[in-house]
Structures are given as structure tokens and as C-alpha cells.
Amino acid sequence: MTNIRKTHPLTKIINNSFIDLPAPSNISAWWNFGSLLGICLILQILTGLFLAMHYTSDTATAFSSVTHICRDVNYGWIIRYMHANGASMFFVCLFLHVGRGLYYGSYMFPETWNIGIILLFTVMATAFMGYVLPWGQMSFWGATVITNLLSAIPYIGTNLVEWIWGGFSVDKATLTRFFAFHFILPFVISALAAVHLLFLHETGSNNPSGIPSDSDKIPFHPYYTIKDILGALFLILTLTLLVLFSPDLLGDPDNYIPANPLNTPPHIKPEWYFLFAYAILRSIPNKLGGVLALVFSILVLAIIPLLHTSKQRSMMFRPLSQCLFWLLVADLLTLTWIGGQPVEHPFITIGQLASILYFMILLVFMPIVSIIENNLLKW
């Protein structure tokens, strides 16, 4: 008799995705981040659900409801800080996951890659709206500045912004709808993640060498389940240390001041994981140009498969491309630093140079260096 695990319609899906899934024998710890992102998503949905039980999406009471959660709700403080820092862990895993995809040529699975880009945009939108909910100074002014960017869209811009706001400024209507969207989007993300996985399992996983691994597969369980559990333990340990020892390390102190439309904070900046994009936005003096650069800084990932000129899929055996990749990482760290600095000399110039370099590496240097490497192989 065949095992029920392999025959029952429900368990069969789980079996084919997480148990009997044929996986390459040589995938490294860089392939852990998919499962870690799944864990982050589950954690965020659960902590968010418990926070939503006590939160009120009204401008008069939003700030005090968050204070109430931290002070009066049983273990409310740990739920709130796990949710806030869980978002940071989510983005750490996301950036490493995307970086892995760039390094090892995982973008050569176009459907999986494109759904991944949609997921990245959706997660960024969710995180932005979540940051508005505590209704502190940075929440309010962040919402005002970022939504205002849409007014740069010709002809319909102003109407669009007022439609999103639900009035003539960020107010009660804005907060209520942001809460509604922030609640529903994680479930959209879950559905997209399932589709992401569906397309991945159509082709099978890539591996560090970039060479097809059909001749050498091993079952996902127990080999990679145990490996993923180790990664999950590291993730939970890091998150726990962050939550229990320095929960406000990655936050902004200004967000402990209730939102005041009459008082602008000295430096309006988003959470750390958006700073690289914020730096690119600010480095262009024109409003519409800045918005386009901001969107394109993520959307550029969609055209990377078209710019793949190398004969090899992975960067494992391409030292020149590796140098460029790590230059890109350094450039993104520079942009993140610049995004948190005030708009003054020398930060403006550094930000502009780093922004130009970011697009140049991805759109110009990578394809050219790949062609050079192809020619070096002939020698």
C-alpha cells in the first residue's frame, strides 16, 4: 500500500514541495533564505494579528493604543518589538535572497524571478504602510513625503495623491485605509509566495555552480529540512537578541513623539531598509526624475536576465564579475548610509556618485565584463 503522504490530495502537495522534492546535492547556506522568509512571514502575520486586536486606527487614539499595547497588554511589548524588528529581519533575508539570485544567476528562471520582484514591491509597500500606523512624528511625515511623490506624475498626480489620502492631507482616512491595506497585504504576499514556489518547482532549484544538476539530486527531507532548521535557529536567535537587548536600535527616536502636522522633524527618513532607495530618490534634483529613479532602482532587477551576456550562469568561476558584485554590495551600503544623512555637502555628491555607480554596475559594467570573461575563456 502506498504511503498516504504520497496519495492524499492535501499531503501530496506538502510531500512534493518539502519532503520528496528532488534538490541539488550541492546547494549552500545561501539557499536557506527562502525558507527563512517563509518563517518571517508567518511570524509577522501572527504578531500582527495579536497587535491588531489592541490597535485602533484613529488619529486621536493610534499613538496611545500602541503605548497601551506596550504598557498594559500581557507581553504586548514583546509582540510589538518582535513585529517591528521582525520586519528588519524580513528585509535582511530579502536582500540576501535577492543578492544570492544575482550572484548565482537564479534570474535565469524568468517566471520565478519576476514574481520575486512583485513580492519585493509588495513587501516594501506593506512595510511602508506598517511604519505609518504607530502615528508618531516619523510615521506622519514619512507618509506625507512618500505619498506626495505621486504628485510628480503628470496630469493626474495631484488628484491621485488626494485620492490616496482621502482628503487634502494625511489624516484619519489615510490612517484607516493604511491599516486595512497593511492587514490584507501579508495574505496577498502569502499567495504570491505560493506561486513563486510553484514556478520554482517547475524548473527545480539552481545551484552554486550554475550547471544543471538533474543527474545528482537528493530528497529535500531530511537533508535540507535539517539545514533549514539550523538557519531558522540562527534567525530566531538574532531576532530574540535584538528584541530583548536593543529593541529600538533600528527605529527612529522621533517616532516616540506623537504626530504633529505643525512641527516638521529636522531629518525625515524612512526605516533603514529603504534608505538606499531614498538616497537614490534624493540624489536627483528633479521630482519626477527622482521618483522614476526610485522605482527603477528596484525595477532594474527585471531587466537583468536580458543583460546576461556570460556563457556561464553563476559567478562562481567569474572573478571579474565577482569583483563587480561586491562593488555593488559596497555601493548599496554606501547608499544606505547616505540615505540617513542630512542633505548637505559632501553627502549630496557622494549620494549622486553612488546612485550613478549603482545603475552603471548593473546596466553597463556587468554585461561588458561578462563579454570580456567569455573572451578570456578562449585563451
Curated annotation (Swiss-Prot):
Assigned keywords, A-Z: Electron transport, Heme, Iron, Membrane, Metal-binding, Mitochondrion, Mitochondrion inner membrane, Respiratory chain, Transmembrane, Transmembrane helix, Transport, Ubiquinone
Subcellular localization: Mitochondrion inner membrane
Chain sites annotated for binding a ubiquinone: 201
Gene Ontology MF terms in the entry: metal ion binding; ubiquinol-cytochrome-c reductase activity
Topology term for the membrane: Multi-pass membrane protein
Co-factor requirement: heme b
Transmembrane segments: 33-53, 77-98, 113-133, 178-198, 226-246, 288-308, 320-340, 347-367
Residues bound to heme b b566: 97, 196
Top-level lineage group: Eukaryota
Gene3D superfamilies assigned: Cytochrome Bc1 Complex, Chain C
Details of cofactor binding: Binds 2 heme b groups non-covalently.
GO (cellular component) term, any one: mitochondrial inner membrane
InterPro entries according to UniProt: Cyt_b/b6_C, Cyt_b/b6_C_sf, Cyt_b/b6_N, Cytb/b6-like_sf, Cytochrome_b, Cytochrome_b_C_euk/bac, Cytochrome_b_N_euk/bac, Di-haem_cyt_TM
BP GO terms, sorted: mitochondrial electron transport, ubiquinol to cytochrome c
Binding site for heme b b562: 83, 182
Note: Heme 1 (or BL or b562) is low-potential and absorbs at about 562 nm, and heme 2 (or BH or b566) is high-potential and absorbs at about 566 nm.
Subunit structure: The cytochrome bc1 complex contains 11 subunits: 3 respiratory subunits (MT-CYB, CYC1 and UQCRFS1), 2 core proteins (UQCRC1 and UQCRC2) and 6 low-molecular weight proteins (UQCRH/QCR6, UQCRB/QCR7, UQCRQ/QCR8, UQCR10/QCR9, UQCR11/QCR10 and a cleavage product of UQCRFS1). This cytochrome bc1 complex then forms a dimer.
Family: Belongs to the cytochrome b family.
Function: Component of the ubiquinol-cytochrome c reductase complex (complex III or cytochrome b-c1 complex) that is part of the mitochondrial respiratory chain. The b-c1 complex mediates electron transfer from ubiquinol to cytochrome c. Contributes to the generation of a proton gradient across the mitochondrial membrane that is then used for ATP synthesis.
Protein name according to UniProt: Cytochrome b
Originating organism: Neovison vison
Classification lineage: Eukaryota, Metazoa, Chordata, Craniata, Vertebrata
